[in-house]
Amino acid sequence: MLKCFEIQPDCGAVGPVLRWPAGTLQEAGCGLQPDGYPIRHGRGDPSFSVKALKRYQLVDYVSGACLMMRRTDFLEIGGFDPIYSPAYYEDTDLCMRLRGMGKAICLTSRAECYHIENATSHGVESAEWATRQSEKNRLIFMGKWDKILK
């Protein structure tokens, strides 16, 4: 992942391909729909070929499950916005603010991470809570970014 910063000098954040523990593809970077809902590239699609991806490619955002960025950029944009606490859309907002600084958001197909999706919130909250929290934060996110996304 570190190599991406050398190859792509304007890189603001880089993330790996994410897989569920069983090995199924969770996402290869993310796009954003005009309504703020994510497009998780390749999600659960057995025909999606990670090997066919470029080594580094631009995406709208990468998941905070595994995200690398420069400390100076993190401090300059003020880190994660606490308005999204405790979870959901904080990583998406962070990447949007980096993009607003002219930084690129990159996926590297050369790194993979196994991720138990929603494990943090499901350990203390219900699936219904996670859905409500995600939707609440999507609306906050759209309040900040709707003009850019549409």
At which residue positions do the language-model features occur?
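Short, flexible, basic/aromatic active-site loop/helix in glycosyltransferases
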Residues: 16, 33-60
